[in-house]
Amino acid sequence: MDFLLPDFTPAYPEIFLLLMVCVVMLADLFAGERNRYLAFYLSLLTLAGCALVTCGIYSTEVRYTFTGMFVGDAMSDILKLLIYVTVAAVLIYSRSYISTRGLLKGEFFSLALFATLGMMVMVSANHLITLYLGLELLSLSLYAMVALQRESAIATEAAIKFFVLGALASGFLLYGMSMLYGATGTLHLPELAKVIHSGQADHEIFIIGLVFVVAGIGFKLSAVPFHMWAPDIYEGAPTAVTLFIGSAPKFAAFGFVMRLLVGGLGDLVTDWQGMLVLLAVASMAVGNIAAIAQQNIKRMLAYSTISHMGFVLLGFIAAGENGYSSSMFYVIAYVLMTLGAFGIIMLVSREGFEADKISDLKGLNQRNPWLAFMMLLVMFSMAGIPPMIGFYAKLSVLQAVLEAGYIWLVVVAVMLSLIGAFYYLRIIKFMYFDAPEQTQPIMFKPDVKVLVSINGLAIILLGMFPQMLMGLSLSAIQHSM
């Protein structure tokens, strides 16, 4: 019997990354204590190699492999490139932080790369099992990363909470997927869409399955009422891990929603739109209101994330190419702002001191004016003040929602954004108008200063000239639908 090998081309980046993870682990095993940075540089080299491979196979044509379970298209390739850049930035920001806290070891970098592999699989999944495998690879890596600082009781507690709630969410998702399979007899997303479109299956079973699927998605996006894990994990995890959790996985979550809700369950749009409206409004309300009361800056940014995810969901509610592309643009803007915020928090932290309270930023302008200015740009952008990228991201989503006819939703979103501006501007007040509690100057390596500068510059320039990034998002959506 002849055995035909599948065309591995769409999966070349994943195969390359998997091989390089093995190299990183072996190199770290034999490197010894004096060469601990070897795993760091190999990880950056791996991400650069993945980017080159992805660019080499990039095409606007849709390519399938592994009997249609894995897909390569413009959206998956662009999301993967964004994931590589984000993970590389996280590693550079985190280098000094993890070095002074005993986390500069191969396990940290191996887990980060395995999590990256999970994200890549998620954005290229064309099958419910592939989606779930990518999600679990990402989730299990993140659980281990949170618990990596074994001597920290709060980190261990956060990891246990993350694991238990994550397992519950995975159960919801699996149950929903099993209902969809029971109703259609297929796990392939295109086949699922065909059966739904034909109207052959029982609509009630679809709705039950859809409820569980949306609940699982809500957890992964930290949307209310499935947000309980986010504040505790953001606060309890080492800041480097918090930055990782709060940045790159959002691209994977966006790809997950696009593949499952839009690609597989697109004909049920009127059903899942109603569910997403509830999640979006609740997320924006709870996130913005709860953030006001926080004194811990990591918890505040966790609630901020919840409110931002509400805006991301608005793009899916608007539907259509404009809605989905504005949602993708918002995710890019959010990740850019998150990198800047947590990167600066890690720079303010030092050995034996964690800058995890809002008051720790008091007088930052006197200690390091340049760093304070970068944080000011990030906070202005998060608040949605022009000409920052955060303003245009909010504007593009609201325009799409308005075009879809949800005028009341636009009014609610604007009102809740105004409430949210308070806690962002409060940080600026602490940095510029309060006396510093710490007088020690803030020192860091030149490459980190360059990265923060690029981060801040991108927030301004992409806000003033968003056409290229918006066009990229629109192109990715058009070629994947």
From Swiss-Prot:
The chain crosses the membrane at residues 11-31, 37-57, 74-94, 103-123, 128-148, 162-182, 205-225, 238-258, 272-292, 300-320, 328-348, 371-391, 405-425, 457-477. Its EC number is 7.1.1.-. Keywords: Cell inner membrane, Cell membrane, Membrane, NAD, Quinone, Translocase, Transmembrane, Transmembrane helix, Transport, Ubiquinone. It is a multi-pass membrane protein. Its main location: membrane. It is found in: Cell inner membrane. Belongs to the complex I subunit 2 family. One of its GO terms (biological process) is ATP synthesis coupled electron transport. It catalyses: a quinone + NADH + 5 H(+)(in) = a quinol + NAD(+) + 4 H(+)(out). NCBIfam families: NDH_I_N, PRK05777.1-5. NDH-1 is composed of 14 different subunits. Subunits NuoA, H, J, K, L, M, N constitute the membrane sector of the complex. GO terms for molecular function: NADH dehydrogenase (ubiquinone) activity; NADH:ubiquinone reductase (non-electrogenic) activity; quinone binding. This is NADH-quinone oxidoreductase subunit N. The gene is nuoN. Pfam families: Proton_antipo_M. The keyword Cell cycle does not apply. InterPro entries: NADH-Q_OxRdtase_suN/2 (IPR010096), ND/Mrp_TM (IPR001750). HAMAP family: NDH1_NuoN_1 (MF_00445).
